């Protein structure tokens, strides 16, 4: 049976479920999760999406992204997928949500209400090769500059939210100081 995604309205109110590929072909708005893991040096862990992924293959992206299953809370889905994709278990905090829409190169449509989580982990990930073919720790300022120079090397959703991610990290540092 095909994986299902949770269909939502613009307020993130659940309105149904649909097959994942059907939702990406039709452009149905559905719930998603994006995880950003930082180390103690405040570097962000990026993954390079596996060549076998059905969209955005071979592109650099945030640490982990996926969809919650029907009746699964976003926080639980985020912890599950972070373990499955990158072999990392850590505390995650939801930071914000945003909606983005993009027509991808293979004519699939990303139309997601994305819940963004931050976590902290020191050490190397153990990526699932079906999900990620490479990884690296990067400084956020370097990433912002590289996204400006080479946007084609990154997932659309990373570009869509990176400025808000950077602003949240700045707010977090200000609160701690």
UniProtKB/Swiss-Prot annotation:
It is found in: Cytoplasm. Pathway: Isoprenoid biosynthesis; dimethylallyl diphosphate biosynthesis; dimethylallyl diphosphate from isopentenyl diphosphate: step 1/1. This is Isopentenyl-diphosphate Delta-isomerase 1. It comes from Aromatoleum aromaticum (strain DSM 19018 / LMG 30748 / EbN1) (Azoarcus sp. (strain EbN1)). CDD domains: NUDIX_IPP_Isomerase (cd02885). One of its GO terms (cellular component) is cytoplasm. The lineage of its organism: Bacteria, Pseudomonadati, Pseudomonadota, Betaproteobacteria, Rhodocyclales. Residues 28-160 form the Nudix hydrolase domain. Mn(2+) binds at residues 24, 30, 67, 110, 112. GO terms for biological process: dimethylallyl diphosphate biosynthetic process; isopentenyl diphosphate biosynthetic process. InterPro entries: Idi_bact (IPR056375), IsopentenylPP_isomerase_typ1 (IPR011876), NUDIX_hydrolase-like_dom_sf (IPR015797), NUDIX_hydrolase_dom (IPR000086).
